[in-house]
Amino acid sequence: MPLLQLILVALIQGVTEFLPVSSSGHLILLPRLTGLEDQGQAIDVAVHVGTLAAVVLFFWRDVRAGLIGLPRALIGRLDTKGARLALGLIVATIPTVIFGTFLYFTGLSESLRSVAVIGWTMLVFGVVLYIADQRGPIDKSASDWGVRDAVIMGLWQMLALIPGTSRSGITITGARSLGYNREDGARIAMLMSIPTIIASGVLLGTEVALDADVDLMRDMGIAALLAMASALAALALMMRLLRSVSFTPYVIYRVALGMVLLFIAYG
């Protein structure tokens, strides 16, 4: 793969994976604007690994607490913060697994990957994020997250399987509609991404593991490192800005990009 394409794909995926702007919406524009071919599943796996490493490193304290609490959560002992976090992440992932299985076996996952669908989801869910952010109460923090809210946010996250929705954007929408403050809502949404990124990475990885050669492994390593670095930078910037800035700038960007995609689809 050309080095320039490798860099562009890794940076786009890394920056947009955790911002509420949809990585798929950007990646579908790349070949149309540059004439480059699709990067392939192997590079998709690599950038997933890179973004997974980024979120684990950025929220390592929460990840450690969740891993330590996981055995207690599995036997129903929710007497620690880590156990409650682990249970919440498990519960929140279930709707996505069920819906993803449905899309896979019905073949709908491929039919949804059109420019028109991505344009509409970018636009519509951008507006939904704005409404939730501006009208939602701010009376909850991460310590209030329990099974009920995990189920609700998991149902929101399920919609992210429709390309253009933005996994981080839709889960943040769910968090704000439930009353979580912006910073903690984003933090919960980022932690919820870990099981889903692992699941999608494993699914893609099983399809490319036997076909990788030395050159491809090198490209995958470069892509993973670039995606991790750019994702870490994007996470740090967003979490810092959320202390004083709403999600409105992301909404404006989403709506504008959605309109561009709709123009491409119907123009």
UniProtKB/Swiss-Prot annotation:
Key words of the record: Antibiotic resistance, Cell inner membrane, Cell membrane, Cell shape, Cell wall biogenesis/degradation, Hydrolase, Membrane, Peptidoglycan synthesis, Transmembrane, Transmembrane helix
Transmembrane segments: 1-21, 40-60, 85-105, 112-132, 188-208, 219-239, 245-265
GO cellular component: plasma membrane
Membrane topology recorded in Swiss-Prot or TrEMBL: Multi-pass membrane protein
One GO-annotated biological process of the protein: cell wall organization
EC numbers for this chain: 3.6.1.27
Annotated InterPro entries: UppP
Entries under Pfam families matching the protein: BacA
Keyword Cell wall biogenesis/degradation annotated: yes
Reactions catalysed, as given in the entry: di-trans,octa-cis-undecaprenyl diphosphate + H2O = di-trans,octa-cis-undecaprenyl phosphate + phosphate + H(+)
Gene Ontology molecular functions: undecaprenyl-diphosphatase activity
Domain of life assignment: Bacteria
Subcellular location field: Cell inner membrane
Enzyme class, spelled out: hydrolase
PANTHER family: UNDECAPRENYL-DIPHOSPHATASE
Further comment: Bacitracin is thought to be involved in the inhibition of peptidoglycan synthesis by sequestering undecaprenyl diphosphate, thereby reducing the pool of lipid carrier available.
Recorded family membership: Belongs to the UppP family.
Role: Catalyzes the dephosphorylation of undecaprenyl diphosphate (UPP). Confers resistance to bacitracin.
Protein name per UniProt: Undecaprenyl-diphosphatase
Taxonomic source organism: Ruegeria sp. (strain TM1040)
Gene: uppP
